[in-house]
Amino acid sequence: DKGPAMKYRTDNTPEPISSHVSHYGSDSSQATQSPAIKGSAVNFNSHSMTPFGGPSGMTPFGGASSSFSAVPSPYPSTLTGGGTVFVALYDYEARTTDDLSFKGGERFQIINNTEGDWWEARSIATGKTGYIPSNYVAPADSIEAEEWYFGKMGRKDAERLLLNPGNQRGIFLVRESETTKGAYSLSIRDWDEVRGDNVKHYKIRKLDNGGYYITTRAQFESLQKLVKHSREHADGLCHKLTTVCPTVKPQTQGLAKDAWEIPRESLRLEVKLGQGCFGEVWMGTWNGTTKVAIKTLKLGTMMPEAFLQEAQIMKKLRHDKLVPLYAVVSEEPIYIVTEFMTKGSLLDFLKEGEGKFLKLPQLVDMAAQIADGMAYIERMNYIHRDLRAANILVGDNLVCKIADFGLARLIEDNEYTARQGAKFPIKWTAPEAALYGRFTIKSDVWSFGILLTELVTKGRVPYPGMVNREVLEQVERGYRMPCPQGCPESLHELMKLCWKKDPDERPTFEYIQSFLEDYFTAAEPSGY
């Protein structure tokens, strides 16, 4: 719902404030490339944001832990005592003896919600008490409890969900407006002959008397009544609302209450997924109940105390496009427990998985997701330090999440710390970081440019035919990789911006995200 405020036609039927063509249609002729980068003349001001946020107030090792605070509970703490009834939004299987299992729709009284992520609750149906994940419930009869309400979700993520294969025209969701506080957006999947599958977004405005409307002609006393009416009558919308957009259950925040430093015995390593210089990655089970990914580090890879300190910061970084850190085994050998991602690393996915068959629109969308996660890391004054396709994980429906953020600076191995050693990822590293150890969010931007080449070449090693030492020398002399085969020049221009010699001349991730999200913007008919 970016764009102008709602305009009305003379017949007062609502126009969507933005509509978007499917990224996955076979006919690419309908998509026009974003005008933001044309040839070498770059107009960064075509976006309202500044492209160059220098390393303002950034510590060399990412933000200090004081810049993070525990995520507050979204509901007032006066609930302690069980006055408000909460309803389950999803099914949940207990993972420990202290948890409650429940089904979607079950009602609870909250006994204690001061912990934030896990609340002590009593099931009204069974009378049993136990802990429940707070992001699985909402106050009964609230907007949050409606299955069609998706809360804080951006326009782009709404489009990704609605355009998933198998969804039909008229499928919809309601979310918070990104641009107008207190307003909502209705996002609907549509189809027409010119554009094929696309998504229309309508702003739902709030009246001073508490009512809601999309067009002033039809006003409703609640959001629920507006949605009910729109399911029966299109009333100027592109299509009447059919079914609610399917969604996946969110990840819980952590494995369970007080399950952060966990005993090694609680983990069962089942399927080895891969291995690198510093350890292995396994699919496994925690506590006999919960599927997880487990990264095992070789002895001596990093100091347990330093790791635990960094992990405390990492677990507070929460974003849809970051792999959540669930728990740790803090004695050597260190284990890191995270969400399990079904399709493995982006590198393997591109080389050997379904990624081999992806076309440019899907690859650009994956890049946009990674930029979204990195823009969050940028906002939090953190630094990744090892951004590359091997450290991105892929889930169902081409969802991408960033893994291993912040770990690289803790590695003690001499072959790595020398920065020219065999284990150091020179080909992904900005020259000022490789030569002088100057890691900033701007060196991450350089690495992102290299990751873009991995995406468009389906996992080819950067600088083909060159060894590490050669790469360092050539890049210092001004050499940059040429435009990969089949890659549009405008995307190569973005790569070259990421590889500017002066870190402050490289764009921000905020800019990169908006550039990639709008890369295939449909040409709108005049009058929109």
Curated annotation (Swiss-Prot):
SUPFAM superfamilies: Protein kinase-like (PK-like), SH2 domain, SH3-domain. The active site is at 386 (proton acceptor). GO terms for molecular function: ATP binding; non-membrane spanning protein tyrosine kinase activity. The modification Phosphotyrosine is found at residue 416. Residues 1-35 are annotated as: Disordered. InterPro entries: Kinase-like_dom_sf, Non-receptor_tyrosine_kinases, Prot_kinase_dom, Protein_kinase_ATP_BS, Ser-Thr/Tyr_kinase_cat_dom, SH2, SH2_dom_sf, SH3-like_dom_sf. Residues 1-12 have a biased composition (Basic and acidic residues). The keyword RNA-binding does not apply. It catalyses: L-tyrosyl-[protein] + ATP = O-phospho-L-tyrosyl-[protein] + ADP + H(+). PANTHER family: TYROSINE-PROTEIN KINASE. Its EC number is 2.7.10.2. Residues 148-245 form the SH2 domain. Belongs to the protein kinase superfamily. Tyr protein kinase family. SRC subfamily. This protein is synthesized as a Gag-Yes polyprotein. Residues 18-29 have a biased composition (Low complexity). ATP binds at residues 273-281, 295. Keywords: ATP-binding, Kinase, Nucleotide-binding, Oncogene, Phosphoprotein, SH2 domain, SH3 domain, Transferase, Tyrosine-protein kinase. Residues 81-142 form the SH3 domain. This is Tyrosine-protein kinase transforming protein Yes. Pfam families: PK_Tyr_Ser-Thr, SH2, SH3_1.
